[in-house]
């Protein structure tokens, strides 16, 4: 017959071994789950990046869209609410390029003179941005540089500077007026005013002190009457 102590010892050994194996199994399962979660995140992120790359590739490049900005008819598309097809845009772009190439330098000079000399367009001549907008029918690289030169000449003209002199600084005449007014006031009058102000303040302080003393005496009299009663 085996002793009960040996049986209990064997039972404890088996229980300890089972607990250790269960702990190892749970640790392995947890590590496997963590590995799967991390892989899933990586796969999900990769799929997102791939989808974004595909969308970016499907979109047309901005350089191709903005190659000829002067030929895009924004007002027509805005009012009608329909976008033109690519073939129609290409045809219009080629027509605009041919028309722009047909302009000569003399036409450009006449257009600039008309813009500057026309009295109805005087407001646009003073503003360089409006000058560039009024000449939008000419080639972009050529008329932009010419309009900038015209604007520089316009603003650097001495006659225009004489016609529109700069406004004087308002702070200096105001300060001069203040100083001149202060110099006209005599010092005796200033000292008299200061003395009068100090006397008035002293009188006010004396009146307040008298009022407080009267109130204190009245309160003391009332307290004495209550105490006697």
Curated annotation (Swiss-Prot):
The chain crosses the membrane at residues 17-37. The keyword Membrane applies. GO terms for cellular component: membrane. InterPro entries: DUF4718 (IPR031695). Coiled coil: none annotated. It is a single-pass membrane protein. It holds the Pfam family DUF4718. This is Uncharacterized protein C1orf185 homolog. It comes from Bos taurus (Bovine).
């Amino acid at each position: 017959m085996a002793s009960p102590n040996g049986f209990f010892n064997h039972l404890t050994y088996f229980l300890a071994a089972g607990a250790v194996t269960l702990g190892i199994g749970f640790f392995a399962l947890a590590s496997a789950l963590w590995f799967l979660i991390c892989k899933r995140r990586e796969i999900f992120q990769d799929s997102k990046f791939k989808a974004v790359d595909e969308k970016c590739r499907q979109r047309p490049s901005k350089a191709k869209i903005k190659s000829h900005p002067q030929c895009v008819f924004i007002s027509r598309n805005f009012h009608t609410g329909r976008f033109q097809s690519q073939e129609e845009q290409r045809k219009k772009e080629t027509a605009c390029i041919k028309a722009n190439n047909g302009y000569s330098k003399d036409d450009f000079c006449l257009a600039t003179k008309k813009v500057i000399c026309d009295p109805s367009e005087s407001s646009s001549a003073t503003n360089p941005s409006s000058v560039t907008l009024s000449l939008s029918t000419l080639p972009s690289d050529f008329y932009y540089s010419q309009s900038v030169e015209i604007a520089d000449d316009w603003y650097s003209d001495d006659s225009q500077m004489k016609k529109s002199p700069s406004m004087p600084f308002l702070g200096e005449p105001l300060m001069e007026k203040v100083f001149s007014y202060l110099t006209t006031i005599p010092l005796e009058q200033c000292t008299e005013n200061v003395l009068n102000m100090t006397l008035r303040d002293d009188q006010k302080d004396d009146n307040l002190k008298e009022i407080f003393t009267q109130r204190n005496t009245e309160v003391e009299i009332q307290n004495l009457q209550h105490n006697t009663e």
